[in-house]
Amino acid sequence: MLYRTMGSTGVEVSALGFGCMRLPVIGAKAQDIDYPLATEMIHHAIENGVNYVDTAWFYHAENFGQPGQSEPFVGQALSDGWRERVNLATKLPQQILKTREDMDVFLNRQLERLQTDHIDFYLIHGLTGEAWDRVRDLGVLEFLDKAREDGRIRFPAFSFHGQAADFPRIIDSYDWAFGQIQYNYMDVDYQAGTAGLRYAAEKGVGIVVMEPLKGGKLATNLPSEAQAVFDRAAVKRTPPEWALRFVWNEPGVSLALSGMSAMEHVVENLRIADQALPDSLTPEELGLYGEVRVAIKSRIKADCTACGYCQPCPSGVEIPRVLAALNASAMWEDANPGLSGYTQVKGGASLCTECGQCEEMCPQGLPIRDLMKETAALFGR
C-alpha cells in the first residue's frame, strides 16, 4: 500500500480508502448489510494497508434522511482492536439539521453508533453553496471548534455536491483538513472538478475523492468504443485500473474512496493501489481519457451515480434503477428491457407524477422528470 499526506494535517493515509456506502447486503434492502462478508472485506483491506474508513449517518438506510445501518456496522467491524488501526471518518447530516444543538446531538449519537470516543475526520455532509450558508449561520464553525477542543473530533472536513464557484469559497472559509469531491475521468469539469481539486492543493487542503469509478460504471460495461480506445494503450489495464489510476495521478489527491460491495473489488483495488503514484501516467495515456470521455458521453442519457438522495419517490418510482436501465439501453443501443435490467424494476418510470421532489434532492442536477418520460416511452411503462 502506498500512503499520502492528508493536506496539512501531517496524517499519513492509505491511497485507497474503504467507503461504506455500498456494502454487500442480504436480499434487496439496503439496510440488511451482510455482516460476515462485509466484515471480512474490511478486515482484509486493513490487513493489506488500508487505514481509512468512511461512513455516514445516511448510508445503508431504507430511505434517504433516515439513520442508516452503515455506522453501526462499522462500529462493530472495528471493535476488538481494529479501530486503533484506522482513521475513521463520518459525516454531520446537515440536510436534516434544524438548530445548533442538533449538531451535538448527532455527533454524540454517531460516537455511540461507531463505538468510539472520537472521530478522526468529521465531515459536513453534502455541501452546496446554499447549504454552506445555512449551516454556517446555524453556528457550525463554533460547533467544529468546540468538538475539536473537547476531543470528539480530530480534524474537520466537508463533502461537496455544489457548483464549481462555491468550492473555493468554502475552502477559504475555515481550517479544513480536506474537501471531499466527486472526481473521475468523466467528471473533470463537474462540480469542483480538476480546477477545484488543484485550488485546494495550492491552499494546503487535502482532497478525498468519492465516486472514482462513478458508482461502478467505469469498472464494468464500458461502451465498446470506449474500451477500444483503452485497448490501444501500450500497457494493458482493466477498466477499474484505468479509472483509479487517473484519480491517483493527481498529486493533490490524498486518497480515493471506493465503495466496495464484493471481496473481488477489494482484492483488485488493493492491487491497483500498490501502484498509485502521482504523475505516473504518460502524456499518451492521459490523451486516451479524453477520447474515452467523448465516446461515453455521446451515449449515456443520465449522469446518475445511484447515490439514492432522490429516494423515496412519493409515487414509488425507483429512480436510480430506472435511470440505470435507461443508460444501459443507451450504451448498448438496445431497448430490450431484460438486457437493460428494467424487467426487475417494480417502480417504473410511468408512475412519475412530475412533482419534482427528486430534482430538488439530486446532487447531480439531473432533469429527472424528462428522463422518466423518455424511459416510459422507451420501455412502455
What are these regions (language model features)?
Residues M1-V86:
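N-terminal binding-site loop/beta-alpha segment at the start of enzyme catalytic domains
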Residues M6, F18, A45, V53, ...:
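Conserved, mostly hydrophobic/aromatic
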Residues V13, V53, R85-V86, T116-I119, ...:
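Local beta-strand N-terminus motif with an aromatic residue
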Residues G19, A56-Y59, Y122-H125, S159, ...:
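Conserved residues at the C-terminal ends of beta-strands
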Residues M41, I46, N51, A195-R381:
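Structured C-terminal cap/extension of enzyme domains
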Residues Y52-F58, R154-F158, Q180-I181, L255-L257, ...:
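Short catalytic-loop micro-motif centered on adjacent basic/acidic residues
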Residues F58-Y59, D80-R100, H125:
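Structural motif corresponding to the early beta-alpha repeats
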Residues Q94-M210, N221-Q227, A234-V235, N249:
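Glycine/proline-rich, positively charged
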